[in-house]
């Protein structure tokens, strides 16, 4: 009634705090709906999302969904060694009688765990350094941060990871540290490029004129406008981290036996190609599926945040 009277008198309607919160919730729901519509238009991205969810659930509940959980550890059964895929052993068995399907699922768990931990370690510092360098462009802060970043980017990522992993004791955690050391500069470079563009936008200038603190400008004004490229890169980087981690395990510098690793399984199975092909092929196919799924998911996230062109 008040809103109607205000409109009749040519005045702007006044809203109660509850009404404002309701409008904010409705706007948020509309934004989520539009984002999902953009994402779902790409059917391959939906398939990628469904595949990623399935793989994550399999990895989390590996102890319950695999037929032979004991085969993920130090288990031997030479009487059932090198059995080809059948109804009992879906992916066959390896050279010492362990179920390959079980070990692939547990190896998938190790790979996803490494990817999550690596991104957790590298994204915050990489983004923070990129924000600082971008906002203070042209100062000594920018120079120091970006020169150090360039040094790391100048070294091939795999070579750097191999060098670090070879110095440390080979295991999952040290492999993770080796990959983390080579990955943060990419986020610094990404956010730096975005920050140099955003620092001259009107909303940043307005915040500076009102006396806002630097932390407010960085984390409340600039950072929210870099979220979509960061999320897109993270979804694509999961696949790359898994590939690098598998390479480290392949050369013996990652996850160590008897703990299953997709890279180690491929290395062990390569000795039995082409006769016992299943020992190496199924772990390799698992990597292909994971990489493809996360790349499709990344494409969908990019489309979801894409600005409509008029």
Model-assigned labels for residue ranges:
Residues 23, 90-98:
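Dynamic helix-loop-helix/coil hinge segments at AAA+ ATPase domain boundaries and subdomain interfaces
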Residues 43-53, 95-310:
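Alpha-helical transmembrane segments of integral membrane proteins
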Residues 1-50, 296-310:
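Transmembrane alpha-helical segments of polytopic membrane transport and secretion proteins
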Residues 44-63, 127, 288:
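Short, strongly hydrophobic transmembrane alpha-helices
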Residues 2-10, 58-93, 253-259:
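Hydrophobic alpha-helical transmembrane segments of membrane transport/permease proteins
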Residues 55-56, 74, 223-224:
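Short secondary-structure capping/turn micro-motifs that flank functional sites
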Residues 39, 57, 151:
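Residue-level signature of catalytic and energy-coupling elements of molecular machines
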């Amino acid at each position: 009634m008040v809103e109607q009277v205000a409109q009749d008198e040519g005045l702007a309607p006044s809203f109660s705090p509850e009404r404002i919160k309701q409008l904010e919730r409705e706007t948020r729901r509309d934004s989520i709906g539009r984002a999902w519509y953009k994402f779902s238009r790409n059917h391959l991205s939906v398939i990628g999302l469904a595949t990623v969810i399935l793989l994550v659930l399999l990895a989390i509940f590996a102890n319950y969904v695999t037929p032979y959980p004991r085969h993920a550890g130090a288990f031997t059964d030479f009487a059932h060694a090198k059995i080809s895929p059948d109804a009992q052993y879906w992916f066959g068995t390896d050279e010492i009688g362990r179920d390959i399907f079980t070990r692939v699922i547990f190896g998938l768990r190790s790979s996803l765990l490494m990817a999550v931990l690596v991104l957790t370690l590298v994204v915050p510092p990489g983004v923070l350094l990129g924000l600082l360098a971008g906002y203070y462009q042209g100062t000594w802060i920018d120079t120091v941060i970006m020169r150090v970043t360039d040094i790391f980017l100048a070294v091939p990522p795999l070579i750097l990871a191999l060098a670090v992993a070879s110095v440390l004791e080979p295991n999952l955690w040290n492999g993770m540290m080796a990959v983390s050391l080579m990955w943060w500069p990419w986020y610094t470079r990404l956010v730096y490029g975005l920050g140099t563009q955003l620092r001259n936008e009107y909303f940043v200038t307005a915040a500076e004129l009102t006396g806002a603190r630097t932390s407010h400008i960085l984390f409340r004004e600039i950072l929210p406008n870099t979220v979509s490229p960061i999320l897109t890169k993270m979804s694509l980087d999961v696949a790359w981290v898994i590939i690098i981690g598998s390479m480290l395990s392949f050369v013996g510098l990652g996850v160590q036996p008897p703990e299953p690793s997709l890279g180690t399984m491929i290395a062990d199975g390569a000795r039995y190609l082409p006769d016992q092909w299943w020992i190496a092929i199924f772990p390799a196919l698992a990597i292909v599926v994971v990489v493809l799924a996360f790349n499709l998911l990344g494409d969908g996230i990019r489309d979801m945040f894409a600005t409509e062109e008029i």
